[in-house]
Amino acid sequence: ELYDMVSHVLVVRKQREHDLIDEQIETLYMQGVAATIEPEPAGKADAMMTLRLLTLTDLLVFFNGELTADDLQKVTTAYPQAWPAAQKLYAVISQKPVDTPFTMRRAVVKLFKAFDDQMTAWHLPVLHGTEFVTVQSVLSERQERLEVRQLFDVYHSDLLDKNKHTRAYIGLYKSDRQNAFVLPAPAQKKSDAFFKEVYDKTVKELFQEMNLPYTLR
């Protein structure tokens, strides 16, 4: 959902450039939002808060953050907690232009963190998207040639490899701590030797061995 939300920035931009979104479509969109999420119960967070947050943030993406006075009155009245929270997430998405694979990845990573911060504030379960969602890497040619140890930290995790039924390792970017890849634990090799072998490879070598797609910028 969060990744799709950022991609919708590009989709909506193209649709509006080609005049595919008019007032009728916008009215239908608002009706769809009202049909999807109920108004908040007074003064408390319920089980629908997460859905409200996602739906309203997507609404802001659809309208480029600009609602009519009438629509704004409706959402602020019906969703007094979720609406300002959605505005915060939208501010993360729209802080910088989303127009390249690199800027899209950056927005997704920041959105994962902002979403979890909001879930924590509401005392709701967090997504842990930074650790458990693998986001495709966007690398420069120089980064391709770096050793894995220069760009990533590899850790034990609670993830299980679905084929080997063993615990997996995750590779986190040093810069933003986002999950970049998941490695199955070796069946027989000691972990120290395994880590050294992985860290000694270039990033390009590791990704090619894993058949892991990435984008060059």
What do the predicted segments below correspond to?
Residues 1-27:
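Post-HExxH zinc-binding segment in Zn-dependent metallohydrolases
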Residues 14, 92, 209:
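Residues that form generic nucleotide/phosphate-binding pockets
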